[in-house]
């Protein structure tokens, strides 16, 4: 029997910011390789940077917002040695979110298309899955909201 050779591929760790204001979640509309989806601000952790610093930097770059870490929400360790960190982040009410940029994505058609505040029922089930992965259920109010749905799961945007 021939032994299978595995090649290690380095993938840097990522960090994301979960920002909630007035019951809405700060989301980004992204079109990447022809696929449109909604996600939270975040990206790769740079050398010498902590996961917390990365989450705040990404929030500033992508949404134009200065934030403060409230607490860590989740850490997911990957098979390739990388990790995904998520943090609940507070942003002052006097700041307006703007569609920023991703310095790693240059060109005339960047993937980040729009920054917007969305309620949970406005987010499709497939995009919501990533919010659960990032620990949204531990943010005040969201566990109760999901429980209030009972056995029904909504599928906003179905048929779009």
Give, region by region, the residue ranges found by the protein language model.
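Residue-level preference for beta-strand/loop junctions
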Residues: 9-11, 36, 81-83
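Active-site segment of metal-dependent pyrophosphate-handling enzymes
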Residues: 64-104
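Nudix hydrolase/Nudix homology domain
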Residues: 35-36, 102-160
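Hydrophobic pocket-lining residues within nucleotide cofactor-binding pockets
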Residues: 45, 91, 120-123
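Short, well-ordered beta-strand micro-motif
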Residues: 19, 86-90, 116-119
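Acidic, metal-coordinating catalytic segment for phosphate/diphosphate chemistry
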Residues: 1-16
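Conserved Nudix-box catalytic region and its N-terminal flanking loop in Nudix hydrolases
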Residues: 21-61, 160
